[in-house]
Amino acid sequence: GASGGDAAASGFTVSAGGSTVLGFSFSGATISSGCGTLTNLTLNGTATGLSGITVSDSDANSVPFEYYDGSGSGNLGECTVQVIHNSASPTVDIYLDGALAIEGFEYRAATGLLTLPTAFTVGIAPAGGAVIADFPFELADGGSYVVVATGLLGDNTTPFDLAATATTFGSSGSDVVGLEIYHGSTDAPAVDIYANGSALLTDFSYGDFSGFVEVPAADYVLGVAPAGGDPIAGFTAPLSGLGGGSAVVFASGFLSGDDPAFGLFAALNDGMVLELSALEQDC
């Protein structure tokens, strides 16, 4: 049989016959994509499960969908996610779909590579406290993503948020290193980034991701300059030992001199975070 769910709540008539479930509405009501449960199915007799399920619209076109059995399992895919705490805020607890997943997650810390379902909700709570914000995600099956906690709690200009981008973990060969760069300094202007004197990124603004790039596995001096200007800071990036791997390099802290001070950090695939040493001389 078939009953209930958001189809019934939206005024649909839902019925089942044989192997077909029909749902139709005389009011023209629709059900929002990705929201709620379409309908509940019950099995009679000796039936123990469902197979070969298809969902079609009124023109017999296939419609993508997700289904769950009584234990809550279903056809959700999986993706790979790394989470980085780059909000100058207190230590937090991270919840996934209401369950505590990361306890005591400190500023400038990172997880390793997590395997997660493609649809999930991240809850953020002060350490030991209740969840104060939820962030739903719907990602691609088989995809790889970095999620960065960024911005400032209670700030209207650069509010707290979870920024995410598709990326690649690892690299195409042992002689190159994969990089994803994130501008996470809330008071820093748009900048140009130089690697050993050559422009790597230009007009790179707060909240921007670079997109995945590969560079030769070597040690670099990264210069940071106001967009269109001369470098005002330099950092050493010892990447020679990371061939075949990758890192997420993120700008962090305040350029104004407030604590925590501005710096560049690199999150490795295993969750280790390296602070890139600042250079005193011009670069």
What residues fall within each predicted segment?
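Intrinsically disordered, low-complexity polar regions and short flexible loop motifs
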Residues: G77-C283
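Acidic, low-complexity intrinsically disordered segments
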Residues: G1-L76
